[in-house]
Structures are given as structure tokens and as C-alpha cells.
Amino acid sequence: MDNFTYILADEDNGEAAVIDPSWDLEKIFGVIEKNGWKVKYIINTHTHFDHILGNQQIAAVTEAKIIQHKNSTQPNDIPVEDGQIISIGKMMIRIIHTPGHSKDSMSLVVNNELVFTGDTLFIGNCGRVDLPGSDSSELYDSLFGKIANLDDSMIIYPGHNYGSTQTSTIGQEKKTNYVLKARSRGDFLRFMASADE
């Protein structure tokens, strides 16, 4: 599935967050231990199994609190909503509710410099909308009403390694990602329906 798991850490005070822990937990623990970081939070961009598989094991070892969007039906410690701010050391993480791929999808804007988009936006593509709880119209609002309005220089870190590169920028994706081509809502819904066929 080519999942990405990320570790955000403030190197000054050692606080860290693990984003979307799935497989290869030994590697995650190794990086945390090597750097002496204290994991404060586990943050899920959404709660499909491949993004939460490692939650309980990491929480058990690190005592980190699990953060998910309030629409989640999975076990969590801190439900969050659109616009909420979470801090990891000096880093400020702003929650953007970006439903479409799932009802509880959210993107994480860090210090207004980078954004973790989960399965809402990939490099060169976007998340599926043929799964239970997915909705093309909601994805349209998330992509064009929220993600595309972020600063063009913001670096994108997606939930899967499906693109030609592992990262990109908002500006680059607006130029090259066919999903972000300017379309009416109706055209976008037809486009997504044809992609699912």
C-alpha cells in the first residue's frame, strides 16, 4: 500500500508526534529511541485500517494520546475539529477537516509551512471516493475550498507514496495534478465517477 508514517519532533524539547502509524513499528520505535524523543501524540489523518494499525502498540509503549477527528468511530483520546490547534514543542499544528475520502479525514498544517494531507490529496492524484463514507462532493469542497487555498509554497506530505515524487508543493500540484484542474462541482463529480469505473 506504500503508506507513509511521519514523525514530527521539536528537537529543542524532544516532544514528538507520530502521524498515521501503520507497519514497520520497529523502525518507528528505533528512530524515536535513537533521538531520545518523547511521543506526546499519535495523530491519524483518518481512520482507515492502514493508517491506525500501529496506534495501540505505540500508545502502550509511549503513553501518547491518540488524536482523531471528532467524526471518527475508532478509539481515541482527543477528538478534534476544524480550526483546532495542537502544539508539539514550538510547532503549531492546525487541523483542517477535509472529508471526502472519509468522513473523518483531516489535514494537518504545521507552522503554515507544510501540510500532511493523508488520503485527501496525493502527489498527482487524490484519495478514492468509492469506499463507505466517502463522498465526491465533500472531496470537491475539501480540495478546492480548503487545500487549494493554502499558500502555494506549502510543502505537501501525502498519506501514500503513489506519485512520481514523495513530496510536492501546493503550487506545483495546482499546476500539474489533473485532479486539481479547475472544474465546476458537477464536472468534478462526473470526473470522479468515471475514475471509479
What kind of region is each of these model predictions?
Residues 21, 52, 139-143:
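Aromatic/hydrophobic pocket-lining residues that form the small-molecule binding cavity
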Residues 9, 81, 99, 171:
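Residue-level detector of conserved, well-ordered beta-strand and adjacent loop positions
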Residues 42-52, 96-104, 156-163:
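Histidine-centered catalytic micro-motifs
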Residues 8, 17-19, 116:
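Conserved catalytic cores of phosphodiester-cleaving nucleases, focusing on short active-site segments
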Residues 1-2, 13-16, 23-94, 175-179, ...:
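Active-site HxH/HxHxD metal-binding segment of metal-dependent hydrolases
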Residues 102-196:
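Metallo-beta-lactamase
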Residues 7, 85-110, 115:
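Core dinuclear metal-dependent hydrolase active-site scaffold
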